[in-house]
Amino acid sequence: MDKTLVSAIEDAFARYSTLTVEEIEDSIRPTVNRVIDGLETGAFRVAEPDNHGGWKVNEWLKKAVLLYFRVHDTTIVDAQPAPFWDKVESRFSGYDAVKFRAAGVRVVPGAIARRGSYFGKDVVLMPSFTNIGAYVGEGTMIDTWATVGSCAQLGAHCHLSGGAAIGGVLEPLQASPAIIEDHCFIGARSEVVEGVIVGHHSVIGMGVFISQSTRIYNRATGEISYGYVPPYSVVVSGQLPAKDGTHSLYCAVIVKQVDEKTRAKTSINELLRGLAD
């Protein structure tokens, strides 16, 4: 990590509201652009594995993203069928066939990706929205009307189904974006937000909503947890009764956990069938 670069971002962010036009043009804007370029290439990640089975948030990168809005003016962003009026350029602005082939990303008409987002090889972007600072691993499909929020992390070989959303976060700085680890399937119209982590090889069924306050009930153990779905979990929406028995409230239910061999050879539909048994 370039400590000089980190220090420059930290110093500029500490003076966010008092930055002068001269220093923005002379040094801060080029420095911020360098960081955003690093996010696009994958050299930097807002959140990354901590080598202890967890994740760490690089707050200085979130500060750089926020500074991007401070040091850039709103301008015309060319697009079809009509231009945009924004501070953030399109991720693929100025791309030609050579650049698209080098990137290895398939971008379908209607897909919107903002500058500062990263896409691995063989990513497919259907008409969808990916925000600044987001990370999308290789071989992942972002399906129609799906949303990847600012700084959200989506691993390799995942499928974010139609209308699903992965929540991002810029403030507070210490807050983590939603993180979907490798080989996960997120069902249509589901949402994972507020820094929830979905462990690798998990399947989230259609219409499941998980935030930090959502109870996650493990049917096999009876355990209730928050904010984390263990690897190889199959999750659907459900309800848990209130203590007084007068009503029930929404929860996410881990209906089963499968091993690596079963997950590899079993289709998503097969995993989700017979869950009421």
Curated annotation (Swiss-Prot):
Source species, domain of life: Bacteria
| Places the protein is found | Cytoplasm
UniProt pathway: Amino-acid biosynthesis; L-lysine biosynthesis via DAP pathway; LL-2,6-diaminopimelate from (S)-tetrahydrodipicolinate (succinylase route): step 1/3
Q: Which Pfam families match?
A: Hexapep_2, THDPS_N_2
Q: Which Gene3D superfamilies match?
A: Hexapeptide repeat proteins, Tetrahydrodipicolinate-N-succinyltransferase, N-terminal domain
**EC number, UniProt record:** 2.3.1.117
- Please list the GO biological process terms of this entry: diaminopimelate biosynthetic process; lysine biosynthetic process via diaminopimelate
- How is this protein annotated for GO cellular component? cytoplasm
User: Self-association or partners: how does it assemble?
Assistant: Homotrimer.
Q: Which PANTHER family does the record associate with it?
A: 2,3,4,5-TETRAHYDROPYRIDINE-2,6-DICARBOXYLATE N-SUCCINYLTRANSFERASE, MOLYBDENUM COFACTOR GUANYLYLTRANSFERASE
Return the protein name: 2,3,4,5-tetrahydropyridine-2,6-dicarboxylate N-succinyltransferase
Q: Which organism is it from?
A: Xylella fastidiosa (strain Temecula1 / ATCC 700964)
